Regions:
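Beta-lactamase-like hydrolase cores
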Residues: 1-14, 18-27, 53, 100-105
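Short glycine-rich loop/turn motifs
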Residues: 5-8, 275, 287, 312, ...
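Residue-level preference for non-acidic, small/hydrophobic
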Residues: 16, 35-42, 113, 145, ...
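Small-residue-rich helix-loop
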Residues: 19-21, 92, 281, 291-441
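Short active-site loop at a secondary-structure junction
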Residues: 21-41
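A short glycine/serine-rich beta->alpha loop
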Residues: 22-28, 221-222, 331-334
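A generic structural motif
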Residues: 26, 79, 418-422
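Conserved serine DD-peptidase/penicillin-binding transpeptidase domain
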Residues: 45-322, 439-440
């Protein structure tokens, strides 16, 4: 492994004694290792008992089943309004809201669906993220009202006969993102050869190619642009499907409910399982939702600048020099997130002593864990449970940092930050180094 673009340090956890290092004071791009810093800051300031909260309100009289007034949804940055914790049922929460309305005797809403997403600002994507990738799932927009990770899937079905146009349907159903399908139906045998794209700035997903005349297929997740509109349209569509038609319009407005509003439902989700999604599965959308929530709770508005300011306070508060941590977002998608291996190790040692350190470490990926980004690494019986940490991968960057227990029982902290390297060669180098440490440390 060449020396340029490389920063490594391995130290004893208890003493801080460095046993191996290369360019350890040299800052490198850290990719998703960034998520360790944002999740630790969120846990530090929000606490392990924190809950995200989204509320549904109604206003007006109910007569003969009709609400002569509007509905209001107030967003709190919750990334979990999806099927992730509900057996993949992305309609689960909306269906509960429909039940709450029906229990109030409502079967139709005459007024508008008002959406308050003012908890965050309206900068939905970080300006330092790669351009031209806005339709990729990992660049889903960040909003105080978000639904289904702000992505859609396209289900592609064959037509009735070979040669007929295939059928493309968007899930979740909404009136914002539409499918335009030119794909044709092929024979029974063969594999689908389909291109699914959403041009930048467009709400139309194009589907082209050929699908076999059997079964159906789903695309990879496709990020949407208008998070608030997607939330509102999906909710309106689901309420209609649940027998609650909405007569008015979707309106985005920062209304705070007063005594004229009646609370219909409160949806809450817990911080710690959310942090586990970030650190185990490296879900960038989750990381940025939490990062802006931290900013909104502490400084009154969910912005990246506020979140980065809070993060500096956190680093200083745990005894670290914040000027040594050049961080630009909460997920690591910005290539400008640069930290030296020695400073990552110092952070890991500080978190081991943190009052919430054990809870935070439990959110990290574990070698061989099928639910984490380390599921294909350190799977051998002798490595089981030995490696706990965070992976990072963007173009030309492969990083790994965390804690490892050697055969001797001694625990080490490590940061292996590789830039200008391919993913597979980076993983191979990191894994060899960690395995050597386990055997000889």
């Amino acid at each position: 492994m060449r020396q340029s673009g490389l920063s490594i340090q391995i130290a004893e956890l208890d003493t801080g004694n460095v046993i191996f290092e290369k360019n350890s004071q040299q800052a490198e791009t850290i990719a998703s290792v960034t998520k360790m810093f944002s999740t630790a800051a969120a846990l530090h300031f929000l606490g392990p008992e924190y809950k995200f909260k989204t509320t549904l309100w109604r206003q007006g009289d109910v007569r003969e089943g009709q609400l002569f007034g509007s509905l209001l949804v107030v967003g709190g940055g919750d990334p979990n309004i999806s099927g992730r914790f509900y057996n993949d049922d992305f309609n689960y929460i909306f269906d509960r809201w429909a039940e709450g309305l029906k229990q109030s005797g409502i079967t139709r809403v005459a007024g508008d669906l008002i959406l308050n997403a003012a908890f965050f600002d309206d900068q939905f994507r970080n300006p330092e993220w790669p351009t031209g990738q806005e339709a990729k799932w990992y660049q889903a927009p960040i909003s105080a009202l978000s639904y289904n990770d702000n992505v859609v899937l396209v289900e592609i079905k064959p037509g009735a006969r070979p040669g007929q146009r295939a059928i493309a349907e968007i899930e979740p159903a909404n009136q914002v993102v539409r499918a335009v399908c030119s794909a044709k139906t092929g024979g029974y045998r063969g594999r689908p050869h389909v291109a699914v794209m959403r041009p930048v700035g467009s709400d139309f997903v194009t589907v082209s190619g050929v699908v076999p005349s059997r079964g159906s297929w789903f695309s990879t997740p496709i990020a949407i642009d208008d998070a608030v509109g997607f939330f509102g349209s999906s909710l309106k569509t689901r309420l209609q499907n649940d027998g609650l038609p909405l007569g008015g319009q979707l309106v985005e407005r920062p209304i705070k409910p007063d005594n004229n509003w009646v609370l219909v439902a409160t949806t809450e989700s817990d911080l710690l399982p959310t942090l586990a999604v970030i650190n185990k599965r490296s879900q960038g959308y989750y990381a940025e939702q939490v990062f802006k929530t931290l900013a909104a709770e502490k400084l009154g508005k969910g912005t990246w600048d506020n979140a980065l300011s809070i993060q500096k306070q956190f680093l200083s508060g745990i005894g670290l020099d914040p000027t040594r941590y050049d961080l630009h977002d909460g997920s690591g998608l910005s290539p400008q997130n640069r930290v030296a291996a020695a400073d990552v190790v110092a952070f890991l040692r500080a978190m081991d002593r943190h009052p919430y350190g054990a809870a935070w470490k439990a959110t990290l990926a574990v070698g061989g864990d099928e639910e984490s980004t380390l599921r294909h690494r350190f799977r051998e019986a002798e490595m089981e449970g030995r490696v706990v940490g965070k992976t990072g991968t963007i173009a030309g960057v492969s990083t790994l940092a965390g804690y490892v227990t050697a055969d001797s029982g001694k625990v080490y902290v490590f940061a292996i930050l590789l830039n200008r390297v391919g993913e597979s060669s980076g993983h191979a180098y990191q894994d060899r180094l960690i395995r050597t440490l386990v055997k000889n440390g």
